[in-house]
């Protein structure tokens, strides 16, 4: 009996020695963690001036040393119905959910891949064809190399794919046209390479669409179900989902985006194009029409609190509280600078040179990493200063500046707030 008791105690001690309890976020005043509150407060007035000038909304959260030191919302989650300004616009709150756009790539797809790599279920040097049957060079391809493409090539954006084949727009996509997920994978397989893999770097949504399909192949689950049940739910995240309107959320909880669907104020047309103000549906055309709202490159919605937890997971080296998703070696592997482009890790944007100043500013450490999203979102994670910043916005919720000249430039995109680095620098400049 004594031996059994001693053995039990030793086993319990042994197991507890290997148990990891990661830091969790708490709130603190800016002064408690090294900020000058008066300097930081100046940002408040500047952002409000941007809202007054026409920027729809900004949600900002700042983490320092495991503490949330600033969380605030400015502006309106919805101020337009079509071209009409609402008499009673809906104010943004700190609980407002936003379309993350390409931050989906990091906080859905990369998080899933980092978890699967840590668990030994995938290796970044594996061939893409291992997980996607039929992914190979076609007889008529002018540029070949799909047969030898590895997952790491996709993550580094050196795989040869074009930036945006516009699959849902038949006028542009031609034979690659697809408005259903079942055919989209086949169209991706048929998409010609634009350059010899490894010869240059082109940031491509196609890369992350492929990665989404790979995750689904490994897990035998839809991408949204996998990340929502194995990552977000264990972390206690309640506002991070794909297709929020199908999962119990209502439009007033979500920031609206483009005023006239995907038409850029009436200059773009293709079959089934949305024309009403987008509110609770992913803005990205490939994600919505070609992938049913769930894709590896876009489609995720979240709020600043949930994003803060996900950024803290990265700062913690892979976990939060008693939840471990991956380890610090995996974090280092994915955030290490690419040999092809110092501003990329494995998917993550890295503060590798001065070209990243508009994103990370001039004061963040060179080890800072994160991502941006076309709808007006930024995440910045600085392991040197143990600091993270998330900016969520709905930049396309304003008129197009000049639809016939450039349909992708919105009036709000011409304002200084559209350059995240300035906001980031004001935050760093407030450190004592």
From Swiss-Prot:
The keyword Aminoacyl-tRNA synthetase is assigned to this record: no
Pfam family, one: Beta-lactamase
An individual GO BP term: proteolysis
Main location group: membrane
Lineage: Bacteria, Pseudomonadati, Pseudomonadota, Gammaproteobacteria, Enterobacterales
Catalytic activity: Preferential cleavage: (Ac)2-L-Lys-D-Ala-|-D-Ala. Also transpeptidation of peptidyl-alanyl moieties that are N-acyl substituents of D-alanine
Record-listed E.C. numbers: 3.4.16.4
NCBIfam families registered for this protein in UniProt: PRK03642.1 (NF002968)
Protein's gene: yfeW
Annotated GO MF terms: serine-type D-Ala-D-Ala carboxypeptidase activity
Protein name: Putative D-alanyl-D-alanine carboxypeptidase
Record's GO cellular component terms: plasma membrane
Keywords: Carboxypeptidase, Cell inner membrane, Cell membrane, Hydrolase, Membrane, Protease, Transmembrane, Transmembrane helix
Subcellular location: Cell inner membrane
Membrane topology label: Single-pass membrane protein
Transmembrane segment boundaries: 7-25
Tree of life domain: Bacteria
Family: Belongs to the peptidase S12 family. YfeW subfamily.
